[in-house]
């Protein structure tokens, strides 16, 4: 095409970014959910493009990010329950890479207070193990709905 084209959709890792650029011939990427889930993604893409080792965040890195995100998006004037609900929207993107069984998201979705939120985050993220660069596949059960279709 005579104009630059950007690719978009499900770019969660530097490897996936490279694959999308190669397979589409696009001149760049638009990244949304992947950057919410992994705020180091742009750094990782640059490292991958330069042939360097890609930074892999540890659980503690993600825990620090969650705390910073809470401070950034929550207004002190808002009710605590509203602040928690707001952060839970972001944690839906992040949570798909925390544990393959989905227990983190299961617990997060039932939280109503900031204390509960940080207790669950500490339980799942207060460790030095590397976090997966790609989200875990969704484990759909019979009766679940996905994009309007029942499984």
What are these regions (language model features)?
Residues 1-7, 11-151:
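Alpha/beta catalytic cores of nucleotide-metabolism and tRNA/nucleoside-modifying enzymes
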């Amino acid at each position: 095409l005579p104009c630059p084209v950007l690719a978009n959709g499900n770019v969660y890792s530097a490897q996936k970014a490279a694959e999308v650029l190669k397979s589409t011939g696009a001149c760049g990427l638009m990244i949304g959910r992947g950057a919410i889930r992994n705020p180091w993604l742009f750094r990782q893409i640059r490292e991958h493009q330069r042939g360097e080792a890609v930074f892999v965040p540890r659980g503690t890195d993600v825990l620090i990010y969650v705390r910073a995100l809470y401070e950034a998006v929550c207004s002190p004037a808002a009710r605590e329950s509203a602040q928690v609900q707001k952060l839970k929207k972001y944690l839906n993107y992040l949570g798909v890479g925390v544990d393959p069984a989905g227990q983190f998201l299961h617990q997060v979705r039932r939280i109503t207070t900031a204390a509960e939120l940080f207790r669950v985050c500490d339980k799942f993220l207060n460790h030095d193990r590397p976090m997966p660069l790609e989200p875990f596949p969704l484990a759909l059960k019979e009766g679940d709905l996905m994009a309007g279709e029942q499984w």
